[in-house]
Regions:
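N-terminal secretory signal peptides
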Residues: 1-15, 22-31, 37
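C-terminal segment of N-terminal export signals and the immediately downstream linker at the start
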Residues: 9, 32-62
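Alpha-helical and His/Cys-centered functional microenvironments
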Residues: 46, 82, 138
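C-terminal amphipathic alpha-helix
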Residues: 50, 54, 60-97, 101-104, ...
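A glycine-rich, hydrophobic loop/mini-helix early in the fold
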Residues: 106-115, 131
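Mid-length scaffold segments of soluble, non-membrane domains
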Residues: 121-155
């Protein structure tokens, strides 16, 4: 039902990074916002989001569990390779950054391709652009942190927040079992984890970052599971 897409050409990577660049440029026209810590962001939104998405969940069928497992793998790939970009940025290892970003591209393609069997090629393309915007905002925050630019951190945080809302709108329109507010809350918390991780890596607080990684991983599992459950409810015959 799901397939992984390998980024075999430099053209795919260039197109993705061009979209990332557009997202980064868009940061400059967004209103400034204070940079909330990931913990504050997570505490504010996660309880409500999870209660809406997971409330009264029925036992999953085998096909739903398989879908959830595939989506978990994709989302863990996302956080793994974005973390590598962050690590190598602080290490100033350009060759390693290039490889990690190639994997970010391939992973984003796979996540976007996962919805094509349900919503079509146009949805795949639209979702890929939104994922590029997400990474663009994370990368902007990373570079701002590396450069010690608090103002750029704030604008990148606003971009990450705006992109989370765009993705929530997109998914909620596609699937009525993915309510906008719940998805928005989940994505805000996810963005908060990226922010916290970047700050901890910059400060070399590796013990704390190890805890953040575990929280981050468990949280993307929740995103994957909520998506699988929603697909199973919307496309009953595909999951029966």
């Amino acid at each position: 039902m799901f397939k992984k897409v390998r980024c075999e050409s430099t053209g795919d990577r260039r197109n993705f990074l061009m979209l990332v660049g557009v997202a980064g440029a868009a940061v400059g026209v967004l209103p400034l916002a204070g940079t909330a810590s990931a913990i504050e962001m997570h505490n504010r939104v996660t309880a409500t989001a999870l209660s809406r998405v997971a409330a009264k969940r029925q036992p999953r069928a085998a096909t739903t569990m398989q879908t959830a497992a595939a989506l978990r793998d994709l989302w863990v790939g996302h956080i793994f390779w974005v973390r590598n970009v962050s690590l190598m940025t602080f290490d100033r290892n350009d060759a390693a950054i290039k490889v990690a970003e190639q994997q970010v591209v391939a992973n984003a393609q796979s996540i976007a391709a996962a919805i094509e069997p349900f919503y079509g090629a146009a949805a795949n393309e639209a979702f890929f652009k939104l994922l590029a915007g997400h990474y663009g905002a994370v990368k902007a925050y990373l570079m701002a942190t590396a450069n010690g630019d608090a103002s750029a951190q704030a604008t990148a945080t606003q971009s990450l927040t705006s992109n989370a809302e765009e993705i929530a709108i997109f998914l909620s329109k596609a699937n009525p079992y993915l309510p906008k507010d719940a998805v928005y809350g989940l994505l805000l918390a996810h963005g908060g984890h990226h922010i916290q991780q970047i700050q901890q890596l910059k400060d070399r607080k590796y013990d704390a970052e190890a805890k953040t990684w575990e929280d981050m991983k468990n949280h993307v599992y929740q995103i994957a599971d909520a998506t699988a459950d929603a697909l199973a409810k919307q496309f009953v015959t595909k999951f029966s």
